[in-house]
Amino acid sequence: MSDHSPLALAQALIRCPSVTPEEGGALSFLADRLSRAGFSVERPVFSEPGTPDIQNLYARIGTAGPVLVFAGHTDVVPPGEVGSWTHGPFSGEVAEGFLYGRGAVDMKGGIACMLAATLAFLDRHGPDFGGSIAFLVTGDEEGPAVNGTVKLLDWAKARGERFDHCLLGEPTNPDTLGEMIKIGRRGSLTGRITVHGRQGHVAYPHRAENPIPGLLRLASALTADPLDGGTAHFDASNLEFTTIDVGNPATNVIPASAKAVFNVRFNDDWTADTLGAEIRRRLEAAAGNAVRFSLDLQPSNSPAFLTQPDAFVDRVADAIEAETGRRPALSTTGGTSDARFIKDACPVIEFGLVGRTMHETDERVAVADLDRLTAIYGRVLDAYF
């Protein structure tokens, strides 16, 4: 097996135990392979009070534009109970056509394919290919994500680095390679409602004020009518209550307060501010003078965004169709990713492996998919430069 093969590269990365925040040797392996290929490689470490220091990697070959960035992360979630794995989570074993290991799908397999495609491209064209290729890789995507891509981009900008397009290799396909390109992501907003009552004995309700009916009234106000009907590239925004709690184990006490937490995944009809204002309007209308409540809104660093379909999106879609025989859907579904940071530096889209087993025991990827994804990335490079 060639050491340029995506399987060999993925196995080497999986064998690095890089559970966030540990680097585990994964970035060191990547840095070595890129520097041997002629890349200039740097390893900035970023810090934030109360969080662990995180190692990152920035590599570039070429000095001219256009600049295509491959982005991703080498950190992985914990493997859980190791004894439950059919093959060790950091073994990188192959069985029945599948590569097993934590990060096989999310997303060491994707990084291996990016690296393999780039090495093959440089073997074909040499270092003077009419542009630049950069790798932007963090060890802080699965964790707090405060010392990773967001700071790496600021660091690169301060050095005068400018990017034209970015391809993020997150696992975007639900079931089959080639199904889906992510061209945007929904925003996320978390809210906490507290309804204030007055504690008392259930036998004397006139001496108390039960907050629970009021909380149910407010919850109904947020869920009775849809927030919107969706937009051209986004489904309708969705509000889900995730917990309701009174902290009251007693059966004969009316609680003093009742609390609920909700999360909204919102589309590009909204910003965090406009959505927050709509939520507050609905709650105040439902509460009137009958329900005393407080609302704490916590916007994440995940606004809704959309990369408009353009020639770059078409190039990636063409490459996928050429290798898989299917035209990928352009989607904005799913959770958040580091694309939420990259969008401020350049247009970004996401395409990677099949995500069905990510974060699961026995996370695995079909070896054939590694080869096909490498070929897709190779076609993108050939079309881009």
From Swiss-Prot:
Cofactor needs: Zn(2+); Co(2+)
Residues at the catalytic site: D75, E141
Cited InterPro entries: ArgE/DapE_CS, Bact_exopeptidase_dim_dom, DapE_proteobac, Peptidase_M20, Peptidase_M20_dimer, Peptidase_M20A
Keywords: Amino-acid biosynthesis, Cobalt, Diaminopimelate biosynthesis, Hydrolase, Lysine biosynthesis, Metal-binding, Zinc
Pfam short name (any one): Peptidase_M20
Residues binding Zn(2+) 1, per UniProt: H73, D106, E170
Domain of life of the native organism: Bacteria
Binding-site residues for Zn(2+) 2, renumbered to this chain: D106, E142, H359
GO biological process: diaminopimelate biosynthetic process; L-arginine biosynthetic process; lysine biosynthetic process via diaminopimelate
Record text on cofactor binding: Binds 2 Zn(2+) or Co(2+) ions per subunit.
Keyword Metal-binding recorded: yes
GO molecular function, one term: acetylornithine deacetylase activity
Catalytic activity, EC: 3.5.1.18
Pathway(s) per entry: Amino-acid biosynthesis; L-lysine biosynthesis via DAP pathway; LL-2,6-diaminopimelate from (S)-tetrahydrodipicolinate (succinylase route): step 3/3
Database matches in PROSITE patterns: ARGE_DAPE_CPG2_2
SUPFAM superfamilies (alphabetical): Bacterial exopeptidase dimerisation domain, Zn-dependent exopeptidases
Annotated S-S bridges: none
Catalytic reactions of this protein: N-succinyl-(2S,6S)-2,6-diaminopimelate + H2O = (2S,6S)-2,6-diaminopimelate + succinate
Function: Catalyzes the hydrolysis of N-succinyl-L,L-diaminopimelic acid (SDAP), forming succinate and LL-2,6-diaminopimelate (DAP), an intermediate involved in the bacterial biosynthesis of lysine and meso-diaminopimelic acid, an essential component of bacterial cell walls.
Known partners and oligomeric status: Homodimer.
NCBIfam families: dapE_proteo (TIGR01246), PRK13009.1 (NF009557)
Xref: PANTHER family: ACETYLORNITHINE DEACETYLASE, N-ACETYL-L-CITRULLINE DEACETYLASE
Family from the record: Belongs to the peptidase M20A family. DapE subfamily.
UniProt protein name: Succinyl-diaminopimelate desuccinylase
Source organism (scientific name): Methylorubrum extorquens (strain PA1) (Methylobacterium extorquens)
Upper lineage: Bacteria, Pseudomonadati, Pseudomonadota, Alphaproteobacteria, Hyphomicrobiales
